[in-house]
Amino acid sequence: MVATTEQTVGKITQVIGPVVDAEFPSGKLPRIYNALTVKGTNPAGAEVNITCEVQQLLGDNQVRAVAMSSTDGLVRGMEIIDTGAPISVPVGKSTLGRIFNVLGEPVDEKGSVNVNETFPIHRPAPKLTDLETKPKVFETGIKVIDLLTPYRQGGKIGLFGGAGVGKTVIMMELINNIAIQHGGVSVFGGVGERTREGNDLYNEMIESKVINPDNPEDSKIALVYGQMNEPPGARMRVGLSALTMAEYFRDVNKQDVLLFIDNIFRFVQAGSEVSALLGRMPSAVGYQPTLGTDVGDLQERITSTKEGSITSIQAVYVPADDLTDPAPATTFAHLDGTTVLSRGLASKGIYPAVDPLDSTSTMLQPNIVGQEHYKTARAVQSTLQRYKELQDIIAILGLDELSEEDRQTVDRARKIERFLSQPFFVAEVFTGSPGKYVTLEDTIKGFNMILNGELDDLPEQAFYMVGNIDEAIAKAEKLKKG
């Protein structure tokens, strides 16, 4: 049903924190999810401009709404206007290179946005008949991901990792590669994270040329932020605002889109705060009773259609490292793969620090990726697993005490570990090494050559921070000549 755009005026009857109750004329009640606005001056002479979203119809012509910004300055009796439609955000090329809040207002002090079209943030998921059901691998050009945890086009990937292990750099490299190789764009939803991190990310994107501040429409990404200091209503809806911008690129521009959500746990946390404010009975561990529905409403819209795809990378915070907590447990049910970043690898200087043994993907099946890819990936994992098992023996007794076969395994595993590292385009400014995009074919060929013993005579440092295997061979020649 299409919402009418007829505007009705009501009166505020109660304000408790971010929750606003209002009374409307009989027969003219706003619908659930309609946006209500309060504009003007309050009796104290303070300017007020607040948008709320209707959550409950209370009876007696009363509605309960949740504010998207601070309710400071609101008083009982003020006029509140029903806009007749849900919150809508700008969509299209004009959003690229800009930072928006949950309402689609630019917050980067770069002036207004030339808005030709807006979309409501509450939209149905694509119909089953419109979905692309054949699983298709999304090539990222990053060796460790393409070989061991291949991403599904239109899939959802959880990105797990602590501070300083390289989540942001991987995100920026993916943004860069989808723009160059797939002609796609990206949308970043900053949900309930630190304002400083949002600012750092924006500046890093300018530095690595993902955002062009002089001509924003040449940028490869749109950013939507609802940071930690925002009211729970904004943090709960900012993910939907980002997703709506991504849906336009998929459905109207027919592009492949990357959607980053950082952090999906904060989305659930905000929903739980709103649920308590609305007086709902909490369920397990204090979460909202509608946890499954809330997460499902967001995740079901992230998918591949016959026109284009939205592939989503979601940073997942695990509270107290408890994977059975309802928030991460509900999220896991929707994920097609997990990319786990390891502090141990980062401390060795191996970047991207993706853990090859802990990371998983539902796409790593012979009937999807092919027999050769599957066998190579499994052989790489078993070699690394054996190396991990032998590390205690090596630490106590040294390499010389190992059997000939185990020594060979260790030698190849160390080469594999180094070959899983790769110079990134977005890190060129820091490393001084030109970035490399490695095709899946080259990746499989390289690892097969290491596993088959064809490169046993090359030094292991030749495999560190190179693109394909030919570069490793050339680097070995260079090292030989000194």
Curated annotation (Swiss-Prot):
The keyword Ribosomal protein does not apply. GO terms for molecular function: ATP binding; ATP hydrolysis activity; proton-transporting ATP synthase activity, rotational mechanism. It catalyses: ATP + H2O + 4 H(+)(in) = ADP + phosphate + 5 H(+)(out). It comes from the Bacteria. CDD domains: ATP-synt_F1_beta_C (cd18110), ATP-synt_F1_beta_N (cd18115), F1-ATPase_beta_CD (cd01133). It is found in: Cellular thylakoid membrane. Its EC number is 7.1.2.2. One of its GO terms (cellular component) is plasma membrane-derived thylakoid membrane. ATP binds at residues 161-168. The keyword rRNA processing does not apply. It is a peripheral membrane protein. It is an enzyme of class 7 (translocase). Pfam families: ATP-synt_ab (PF00006), ATP-synt_ab_N (PF02874), ATP-synt_VA_C (PF22919). Keywords: ATP synthesis, ATP-binding, CF(1), Hydrogen ion transport, Ion transport, Membrane, Nucleotide-binding, Thylakoid, Translocase, Transport. InterPro entries: AAA+_ATPase, ATP-synt_VA_C, ATP_synth_F1_bsu, ATPase_a/bsu_AS, ATPase_alpha/beta_chains, ATPase_F1/V1/A1_a/bsu_N, ATPase_F1/V1/A1_a/bsu_N_sf, ATPase_F1/V1/A1_a/bsu_nucl-bd. HAMAP family: ATP_synth_beta_bact. Belongs to the ATPase alpha/beta chains family. F-type ATPases have 2 components, CF(1) - the catalytic core - and CF(0) - the membrane proton channel. CF(1) has five subunits: alpha(3), beta(3), gamma(1), delta(1), epsilon(1). CF(0) has four main subunits: a(1), b(1), b'(1) and c(9-12). Produces ATP from ADP in the presence of a proton gradient across the membrane. The catalytic sites are hosted primarily by the beta subunits. This is ATP synthase subunit beta. It comes from Gloeothece citriformis (strain PCC 7424).
